[in-house]
Amino acid sequence: MESRLKPGLIVLCGPTAAGKSSLAIAIAQRLGSPILSADSRLVYRDFNIGTAKPTPAEQQQVPHYLMDLCDPRQVFTVGDYQDCAVPLIQQLQEKGMLPLLVGGTGLYIKAIVNGLRFPRIAPQPKLRSQLQALGQPLCHALLQRVDPVAGDRIHVNDRVRTLRALEVFYVSGDRLTDLQQEQPPSYPILQIGLDSDRLEARIQQRTQQMLTSGFVEEVQGLCDRYGSDLPLLNTLGYRQVCAFLQGSLSRSELPEQIVLQTRQYAKQQRTWFRADSSIQWIDAEASNRLERALDLIERFRKSEGV
């Protein structure tokens, strides 16, 4: 890409297991673009199989950024993600590149695309400990009471984001929803959505692949290294494997529960992304999905001069 062209950004989003990573690599190879992750769990080191983190071999094909940024014991907020992503995007654009932002964490993507701003409130370990002692169901009920918009947006089982929203409220006295402000970037952005009418089958296939690739062993290693009370171990997939290791789920029930919870999460993602009318959708099952994506990008580049 010539440096005289304007900076821009391509976003590839959609529900989990739709095939974003493989399509992103194919697009990036054709465009010479770097891939920037927009996944809230890929920022953590050692959480690999259960997060479907691109493998080392995949990462060698195309430069990947915004992964393995911090220790799993650290708190990493959307604001922290912005602090990493915004200057990185600018640096890549200044080098004449067209970055490809890829992921399914809607709030991360919205933070970049809409320029959402977040309160810089430091983690409060004592407050978090007190809230955790109440249990996730009560914490989420409290969030629904003090900040209904955030309560609707944050999944009932998402302990990390529930605690963060409550932390912001109790420390600042303001609702997280009210504190968010939008300052959209000046450069043009193309958002491409990837979805499939066979998503359930894809979820089942990927779950089985994770389990045969050593997911249970990964979780056991994480428990041994960080302790079974690590908040990230209470997230999708890891929570179910922990239950299996503790004896409350059988081997046959394990994949069933992972698939069930993943389907619910995918439904939530679809609702989030489908609410954005600016996203242009591609069928993940279409044989020409790469050509379709490249066509959208080419038309975007011509119209915007990027």
Swiss-Prot record:
* Keyword terms, alphabetized: ATP-binding, Magnesium, Nucleotide-binding, Transferase, tRNA processing
Binding of ATP, residues: 14-21
Write out the catalysed reaction: adenosine(37) in tRNA + dimethylallyl diphosphate = N(6)-dimethylallyladenosine(37) in tRNA + diphosphate
Residues given in the record as substrate binding sites: 16-21
Q: Which SUPFAM superfamilies match?
A: P-loop containing nucleoside triphosphate hydrolases
Top-rank lineage group of the source organism:
Bacteria
Q: What is this protein called?
A: tRNA dimethylallyltransferase
Q: Which organism is it from?
A: Synechococcus elongatus (strain ATCC 33912 / PCC 7942 / FACHB-805)
InterPro entries in the record: Dimethylallyltransferase, IPT, P-loop_NTPase
Similarity comment: Belongs to the IPP transferase family.
Please describe the quaternary structure of this protein. Answer: Monomer.
Q: Which HAMAP family match?
A: IPP_trans (MF_00185)
Q: What does this protein do?
A: Catalyzes the transfer of a dimethylallyl group onto the adenine at position 37 in tRNAs that read codons beginning with uridine, leading to the formation of N6-(dimethylallyl)adenosine (i(6)A).
| NCBIfam families, sorted | miaA
Against PANTHER family, the record matches this protein to: TRNA DIMETHYLALLYLTRANSFERASE
Q: What is an annotated GO biological process for this record, any one?
A: tRNA modification
Q: Does the keyword Magnesium apply?
A: yes
Annotated EC = 2.5.1.75
Q: Identify the residue position(s) of the site Interaction with substrate tRNA.
A: 105
**Which cofactors, if any, are listed as required?**
Mg(2+)
The transmembrane residues are: none
Q: Which GO terms describe its molecular function?
A: ATP binding; tRNA dimethylallyltransferase activity
Catalytic EC class:
transferase
Residue segments, region Interaction with substrate tRNA: 39-42
